[in-house]
Amino acid sequence: MLRLKCASQRYDWGKVGVNSIVYKLQVASENPDISHVDLPYAELWMGTHPSGSSCLWDNPHVTLAAHIQENPASLGKPSLIYFGRRLPFLFKVLSVAKALSIQAHPDKKMAVRLHAEQPDLYKDGSHKPEMAIALTDFEALLGFRPLNQILAFIQAFPELAELTTLELPSPEEKRDVQPPSIKQLYSNLMRSSPEKVESTIKSLLNRFTTGSKSVCDPPLSILGVDLQEEDVQALVDLFLRLTQAFPGDVGCLSIFFLNYIRLKSGEAIFLKANTPHAYLSGDCVECMANSDNVVRAGLTPKFKDVERLLEMLDYTPLTDSLRLGATQPIPTPEGISMKSFIPPVSEFAVDVIQFDAESRGFSLPSVPTASILLFLHGQGTITCPSTGEACSQETKFGPGFVYFVPADMIVNLVSKEDRKGSLHAFRAYVNRK
């Protein structure tokens, strides 16, 4: 078992300094690379991706990727057979102050094609399904709304009709016409000229801020859509925030096409390949296939690959529960909980371990593949009963400590008796047995 020194990413959408959980974890773990308190700290990366590879704490010149190449058995047989001599997931902590781009991650077939055609933009040929577990109140856009909701918004906000080139019947008309597809409507929106987009945004801003019109005309209730008034008002508030941060950006209008979801701490979402999404605010733990491929089309000053995004998106509306449920893999003593978030992919799964303030110890069951163990809160020591000795020279844990745990290793967590508060840890591992 090896302690890791992990990289931070300072994207401009991240929270700044002490407001960022990424910064606070790095400082608490005594990472010597963290010195600038006035910079954004957006992401903590734990894994082997070359854009931010972890290295060994006691020997920072050795990357985790190099260690795995020298010690492939540490990955475990199921992982070696399925993925070879590499760690197939990337584990992260995100601290979001400003909305990330409207984006999607390609499936394997598209990823190979993108990497072959534009390797400078798309760095690898891997797909990138991902999962986010909220640490604080967390906002996101995720997948397309049902078509009837999208059509209702277009009818309630006629300003959108011109961009989608949808000819709307009056409420008195009854026409037996085939409704347009989500792909047709969203493609028309995203291909609109910047001038038309800016004009539509200004018109909606006028509608939402002057009070001269009702917010929805006609009201959504007349249109037979199951959306509450508070849901519409939340969207209006989001629109006002986004237009301040990204004036004139077509992504501001995507909120009427995509599901707006607000997570509480401990709730999770799963994003399969080709699903449009954007993280808007809050803190989360994220796990994904080991790729950094992103196709963007809105809410960003970066390159927008609109045609590519429209080609690859999955336009199937997400009408089931948008949250990923958790299971409890083993019984736990009173005051201790362990939940597992198991997505429908092989690259990763995540356990969440929590002690209350009175609990002292817990034996974390082994998994047959390598794992990365992150401590968010709590202090104590780690021992490995398989050897009867300490796991390594450095066996303490505290906030921000990260460990690489070889396959099949049982880990005993012993909390410090005089610690303040509870223990909160996350374990990511390969979802193969």
Swiss-Prot record:
Its main location: cytoplasm. It is found in: Cytoplasm. Its EC number is 5.3.1.8. Pathway: Nucleotide-sugar biosynthesis; GDP-alpha-D-mannose biosynthesis; alpha-D-mannose 1-phosphate from D-fructose 6-phosphate: step 1/2. The keyword GTP-binding does not apply. One of its GO terms (molecular function) is mannose-6-phosphate isomerase activity. Keywords: Cytoplasm, Isomerase, Metal-binding, Zinc. The active site is at 296. One of its GO terms (cellular component) is cytosol. Coiled coil: none annotated. Binds 1 zinc ion per subunit. GO terms for biological process: carbohydrate metabolic process; GDP-mannose biosynthetic process. It catalyses: D-mannose 6-phosphate = D-fructose 6-phosphate. The keyword Cytoplasm applies. Its cofactor is Zn(2+). Zn(2+) binds at residues 103, 105, 130, 277. Involved in the synthesis of the GDP-mannose and dolichol-phosphate-mannose required for a number of critical mannosyl transfer reactions. Belongs to the mannose-6-phosphate isomerase type 1 family. This is Probable mannose-6-phosphate isomerase. It comes from Echinococcus multilocularis (Fox tapeworm).
